[in-house]
Amino acid sequence: MKKILLIDDSDTYTWCLQKYLQHRGYPVKTACTLKEARAAIQEEMPLVVCCDLDLPDGSGMDFLDEVRAADKELPFILASCHDKDDYEQEAMRRGATLCMDKMKGLLLQDKLVEYAYRQV
């Protein structure tokens, strides 16, 4: 079964979101770096990608470009603690499905991931 791919370098944040989504019945795969995310996508294309904007080995925005080159329709959510006004317009131009503030809480993220999940 295809999974939601969570990409974030915060172990605590990833763990919380993973447990939250799994509790609601979503299968989840996690990655802490873009290298791990690329390997996960080569193994199996996810149903939804939820990616942090800033990662240790690159930008979530650049990873969005890579994903869009391979799949134009895959729901891709870009998440960050940064002000969305700083990156949202560029992310949407590059093909992001949604942009969200990680600090808005897990409920909002669950609803946004659920929305993207249903789009497929």
Labelled PLM ranges:
Residues 30, 55-58, 93:
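Residue-level signal for the "D+5" position in two-component response regulator receiver
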Residues 61-73:
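Short amphipathic alpha-helix used as the core "switch/output" element in two-component signaling
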Residues 33, 59-62:
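Acidic catalytic/metal-coordinating carboxylates
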Residues 44-50, 55:
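Active-site beta3 strand of CheY-like receiver
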Residues 62, 82-110:
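Alpha4 helix (beta4-alpha4-beta5 surface) of REC/receiver domains from two-component response regulators
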